UniProtKB/Swiss-Prot annotation:
Catalytic activity field: dCTP + H2O + H(+) = dUTP + NH4(+)
UniProt name for this protein: dCTP deaminase
Binding positions (dCTP): K109, S110, T111, Y112, A113, R114, Q154, Y168, Q178
Summary of the function given for this chain in its UniProt record: Catalyzes the deamination of dCTP to dUTP.
Annotated organism of origin: Helicobacter hepaticus (strain ATCC 51449 / 3B1)
C-alpha cells in the first residue's frame, strides 16, 4: 500500500472524492484544515450529539437509545462544550467518495490531543460514500471546546497493491451514503 500525496489528493478532489475541498492548508487563528503534504485535514460541522445520563441508563451498541444523546447545533463559527470525562459525536463538513482501490485512515489532530481531547474515526473503506461521523472523547476533568467549521482530524489515503474483490458499496455497508451524524447501527 502506498501513501498518497497532495498531488494525487488534489487530482482526486476534481473527481469528487472530497467536497467541499480546500486546496491549501488554512490555519491562522483557527485549528488548521485543508490539503497537507500527505493527507487532508477535515473540518467538524456545527452539529453535535453529547452523551447524557438523563432519560437513559445504558449504552448498548446493538440497541442504541437515542435518549442517550442531546443534539446541539452551534453558530457556523461557534463551538460546542463537551462536558468533563464525556463523549460527543459530530460530523465532517466534507462529503467523501472513496475510490475502490483506496482505504483512508483518520487520525486526530495534535492540537486537540494535547488538550486531552481524543478523536476517533474508523477507516473509510473502498467505495465508501458519505459524511464522516466523528467520535470525540474529552478525557479531562474540565469542559472542552470543539470549534465548529475548523480542523478536527487528518485523513491519510492508502492505495492498495491491487483492487479489492468486495468494496463497502458492494456489501451495502450500513453507513453508506450517510448524511449528518449517524448513530450506531446493527444489521438485523
Amino acid at each position: 500500500m502506498g501513501l498518497k500525496s497532495d498531488t494525487w489528493i488534489k487530482k482526486m478532489s476534481k473527481k469528487g472524492m472530497i467536497e467541499p475541498f480546500c486546496e491549501k492548508q488554512v490555519g491562522k487563528n483557527i485549528v488548521s484544515y485543508g490539503l497537507s503534504s500527505y493527507g487532508y485535514d477535515i473540518r467538524v460541522g456545527n452539529e453535535f450529539m453529547i452523551f447524557t445520563n438523563i432519560g437513559a441508563n445504558l449504552v448498548d451498541p446493538k440497541s442504541f437509545d437515542e435518549r442517550n444523546v442531546v443534539e446541539i447545533t452551534t453558530e457556523e463559527n461557534g463551538y460546542c462544550l463537551v462536558p468533563p470525562n464525556s463523549f460527543a459525536l459530530a460530523r465532517t463538513i466534507e462529503y467523501f467518495r472513496i475510490p475502490r482501490n483506496v482505504l483512508a485512515i483518520c487520525l486526530g489532530k495534535s492540537t486537540y490531543a494535547r488538550c486531552g481531547i481524543i478523536v476517533n474515526v474508523t477507516p473509510f473503506e473502498p467505495e465508501f460514500e458519505g459524511h464522516i461521523t466523528i467520535e470525540i472523547s474529552n478525557t479531562t476533568p474540565l469542559p472542552a471546546k470543539i470549534y465548529a467549521n475548523e480542523g478536527i482530524a487528518q485523513v491519510l489515503f492508502l492505495e492498495g497493491d491491487e483492487t479489492c474483490e468486495v468494496s463497502y458499496k458492494d456489501k451495502k455497508g450500513k453507513y453508506q451514503g450517510q448524511k449528518g451524524i449517524t448513530l450506531p447501527k446493527v444489521i438485523k
